[in-house]
Regions:
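N-terminal [4Fe-4S]-dependent radical SAM core
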Residues: 2-22, 49-91
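Short glycine-enriched, charge-decorated loop/helix-capping segments at active-site entrances
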Residues: 111, 117-118, 212-220, 283-284
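A C-terminal junction/extension of Radical SAM enzymes
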Residues: 278-338
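Active-site neighborhood of divalent metal-dependent phosphoester/pyrophosphate hydrolases
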Residues: 147-148
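Short acidic, hydrophobic short linear motifs in intrinsically disordered regions
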Residues: 38-51
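Accessory C-terminal segments flanking Radical SAM cores
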Residues: 1-29, 313-338
């Protein structure tokens, strides 16, 4: 069990039952005793432990009834074996090249430490063949285009989409791409619409904060071009923003409001993976991020209550798991179904 506070409210998340609920101090004390016993605490031990904490007999009797009911609930909850299933999605690195020189790029500024390379038609088509051959017959399959900057090899993207639909007309495919947003054009956006693409644009905050981390390799900032492209096309296409949080860029609410104003329909935040002292997240940055997450979580829940589709999506997977009472056996599907 995990106990935590939000504002002046106290909560318990039980990883066994996948329930999250508000608790008072007495309930928390009783649940901690229950958990510490291996969820096998008897009435005598519970009474003794609660009495030692100063609770009266009436309160103890109520807590005993609550724990007895919760114990029965826990016993009915089984962690089923996570049986590996067949492949469902594949990520195509269509370009090991990039026009940006991001300071912390895990891909070595796009080329992964080698000479810039573009994927060939043959490799892309073989990858689609492999995906189909390794999948369940009736399952929708996902093709993800990645890089480097995948739009540098834009012709291959459309060839791959055409190949998947033409060679496998009885299979359903979804398509997605993560791009830096600098190379968007009318033809590409129209094709995104036609084929139902999900498009994420990588950003590092807005304005000078973004430009400090994500300049062009030729020099100069890239944010103004991205901003122009998003505003131009967002009225007709639902772009998503994926913002990287660094030590110099950790004001979630400020960036969220700016991304919303630009026209993004989905907004995600992810922490930087770097040991660079100039950008890695320190305790001060993490505290700012926690505060921002709480503010955005409140907005997220308000939008759900009002029947709206939330823009802030960072917490969506976790909230969906809790609301559906499901459990994720692994944090990432790479090497399993992906």
């Amino acid at each position: 069990m995990h106990f935590f506070s939000v504002s002046d409210r106290r909560y318990c998340f039980d990883e066994v039952t996948r329930n999250c609920f508000q608790v008072d101090q007495a309930s928390e004390d009783a649940l901690r005793i229950f958990e510490a016993s291996g969820r096998t605490v008897n009435s005598k031990l519970l009474t003794k432990s609660l009495a030692a904490k100063g609770y009266d007999q009436t309160t103890i009797a109520e807590l005993e009834d609550d724990i007895d009911e919760y114990q029965r609930l826990s016993e009915r909850t089984f962690l089923t074996k996570d049986t590996p299933r067949k492949l469902r999605s594949i990520e195509l690195h269509v370009s090991h090249a990039c026009n940006l020189g991001c300071s912390y790029c895990f891909a070595g500024k796009g080329d992964y430490g080698t000479s810039p390379l573009l994927m060939t038609d043959e490799i892309a088509f073989k990858a689609v063949d492999y995906l189909v051959a390794s999948s369940s017959e009736n399952e929708t399959l996902a093709i993800v285009f990645f890089g480097g900057e995948p739009m540098i090899n834009e012709p291959l993207i459309w060839k791959t989409v055409d190949y998947s639909k033409r060679i496998y007309p009885n299979r359903n495919f979804t398509y997605s791409i993560t791009t830096n947003g600098t190379l968007l054009n009318d033809t590409a956006v129209n094709s995104f619409k036609e084929h139902g693409f999900s498009v994420l644009i990588s950003l590092d905050g807005t304005g000078c904060k973004h430009d400090a981390s994500r300049p062009y390799k030729t020099g100069g900032g890239s944010f103004s071009d991205i901003d122009k492209n998003v505003r131009r096309f967002s009225e007709s296409f639902p772009f998503g923003a994926r913002a990287t949080l660094t030590n110099n860029n950790c004001n979630l609410v400020e960036d969220y409001l700016q991304f919303k104003e630009m026209g993004f329909r989905r907004i995600y935040f992810s922490p930087v993976s770097s040991f660079d002292e100039n950008i890695k997240l320190d305790e001060h940055s993490l505290n700012k991020i926690r505060a921002g997450l709480i503010d955005l979580a409140d907005q997220y829940l308000k939008q759900i209550d009002q029947g709206e589709k939330p823009l802030f999506r960072t917490l969506k997977t976790a909230v969906d798991l809790i609301m559906s009472n499901r459990i994720a056996f692994v944090g990432c599907g790479a090497g399993r179904r992906f």
